[in-house]
Swiss-Prot record:
The keyword Repeat does not apply. Component of the cytochrome c oxidase, the last enzyme in the mitochondrial electron transport chain which drives oxidative phosphorylation. The respiratory chain contains 3 multisubunit complexes succinate dehydrogenase (complex II, CII), ubiquinol-cytochrome c oxidoreductase (cytochrome b-c1 complex, complex III, CIII) and cytochrome c oxidase (complex IV, CIV), that cooperate to transfer electrons derived from NADH and succinate to molecular oxygen, creating an electrochemical gradient over the inner membrane that drives transmembrane transport and the ATP synthase. One of its GO terms (molecular function) is copper ion binding. PANTHER family: CYTOCHROME C OXIDASE SUBUNIT 2 (PTHR22888:SF9), CYTOCHROME C OXIDASE, SUBUNIT II (PTHR22888). The keyword Translocase applies. Component of the cytochrome c oxidase (complex IV, CIV), a multisubunit enzyme composed of a catalytic core of 3 subunits and several supernumerary subunits. The complex exists as a monomer or a dimer and forms supercomplexes (SCs) in the inner mitochondrial membrane with ubiquinol-cytochrome c oxidoreductase (cytochrome b-c1 complex, complex III, CIII). One of its GO terms (cellular component) is mitochondrial inner membrane. This is Cytochrome c oxidase subunit 2. Its cofactor is Cu cation. It catalyses: 4 Fe(II)-[cytochrome c] + O2 + 8 H(+)(in) = 4 Fe(III)-[cytochrome c] + 2 H2O + 4 H(+)(out). Cu cation A1 binds at residues 115, 150, 154, 161. Binds a dinuclear copper A center per subunit.
Length: 205
């Protein structure tokens, strides 16, 4: 029993740059007429097995379902590509760990210039002013990672300052606390000792 397939003629042109020449993607189309499945046409590309930018496809005769699936996969890949590039802007050397379902009072201070500790998901924006301590109390009921950044034009060589916050359940936080311990909050005048003792490095991983 043979299953007939309706073939249509498609002309598809992708956006390309001017300094790139248009070239055809060589492909071979093999029709499996004895196959009763939905995919009766299998396409074999000699180039990369997905639609590539700066290329042109024209005069293709095959099932419309396979063309739609190919375009759909390429669309999802292009949408996720910007997300993958933006992940590097969220990377931090240290991650601040805090417990959930607890009222947390955050006291901030700055050593050199004015900063702004800003996490949009938690609704927190604290200005860190040198010589002045600012505080803010917040409550977090959702466990997970929260990302933020410094929302202040600090000055020269002060840019791209991301923040990564990890909220753990209270029971897990107690285990983590017992393993790593709390930081030593020492008010010192030395910048090196200030960064090592007061910089909450032991409170992060």
């Amino acid at each position: 029993m043979e299953k007939k397939m309706n073939t249509d003629l498609f002309y598809l042109t992708l956006k390309q740059k001017r300094y790139k020449r248009k070239k055809n993607i060589p492909l071979r189309i093999r029709l499996d007429k004895n196959d009763l499945s939905a995919n009766t046409a299998s396409i074999k590309f000699t180039d990369k097995p997905y639609l590539v930018a700066n290329k042109i496809i024209k005069s293709l005769e095959f099932n419309a379902t396979s063309l739609y699936r190919c375009i759909k996969k390429n669309k999802l890949r292009s949408e996720n590509f910007s997300v993958q590039l933006s992940r590097r802007l969220l990377r931090t050397k240290k991650t601040l760990v805090l417990p959930s379902h607890v009222n947390i009072t955050l006291i901030s201070n700055s050593y050199d210039v004015i900063h702004s500790w800003f996490i949009p998901a938690l609704g927190i924006k604290i200005d860190c002013v040198p010589g002045r301590a600012t505080h803010h109390t917040f409550y977090c009921d959702s466990v997970g990672f929260y990302y933020g950044q410094c929302a202040e034009i600090c000055g020269r060589y002060h840019h791209h300052m991301p923040i990564k916050l990890c909220i753990l359940p209270f029971e897990h936080f107690l285990i983590w606390w017992q393993h790593f311990g709390l930081p030593k909050l020492l008010f010192t005048e030395s910048k090196n000792r200030f960064e090592t003792d007061y910089g909450l490095k032991k409170f992060c991983w």
